[in-house]
Regions:
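A short, N-terminal "cap"/entry segment at the start of jelly-roll beta-barrel domains
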Residues: 1-47, 54-55, 136-138
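Short, surface-exposed beta-edge/turn micro-motifs
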Residues: 42-43, 61-63, 109-110
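Short beta-strand segments in beta-sandwich/barrel cores
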Residues: 44-45, 53-55, 70-76, 93-94
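Short, conserved beta-strand element in jelly-roll/cupin
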Residues: 49, 59-78, 115
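His/acidic/aromatic-lined binding-pocket segments of jelly-roll/cupin-type domains
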Residues: 55-57, 62-67, 85-86, 94, ...
Length: 138
């Protein structure tokens, strides 16, 4: 069965969450993000936020992140390498490799579409390197 999503309508339902931090709870994020549909072994999400997200990684596969509107800095850690900071903006897609820790800083706000595989792990602390903390699982 085909699934059709009207992304303009889905994003119009969301409110921009200002002041997001790595410790912002799911309840506090309500109304700023939405589960849109299942996809393969994962989920398609939409979100609108301003601030800084938590560190996360996905051991089951690569994550696709499309910047619908706005700009951000993507912090990413691959293997034993130092944290790399990469600017992203409207129209860009980032494919985050399986198991790579990553987070976004978006002080002026960003609208994202993500295709997230399977389970996720998080570090919900405001730290520079997630490898120094114990991850939480969803």
């Amino acid at each position: 069965m085909i699934t059709l999503l009207d992304l303009n309508a889905e994003f119009a339902k969301l409110n921009m969450l200002h002041g997001r931090t790595p410790t912002t709870t799911e309840a506090e994020r309500e109304g700023s993000s939405a589960w849109l549909a299942p996809y393969r072994d994962g989920t398609i999400f939409a979100s609108k936020s301003a601030g800084k997200g938590a560190w996360e990684r996905h051991p089951d596969g690569d994550e696709l992140v499309q910047v619908i509107e706005g700009s951000a800095t993507l912090d990413i850690v691959t293997d034993d390498n130092p944290v790399q900071s990469i600017p992203v903006h409207t129209g860009m897609i980032a494919i985050v490799p399986r198991g790579a820790w990553h987070r976004f800083h978006y002080p002026d706000g960003i609208t994202l579409l993500t295709v997230t595989p399977g389970k996720s792990e998080y570090v919900r602390l405001d730290i520079d390197d997630p490898r120094t903390a114990e991850p939480q699982h969803d």
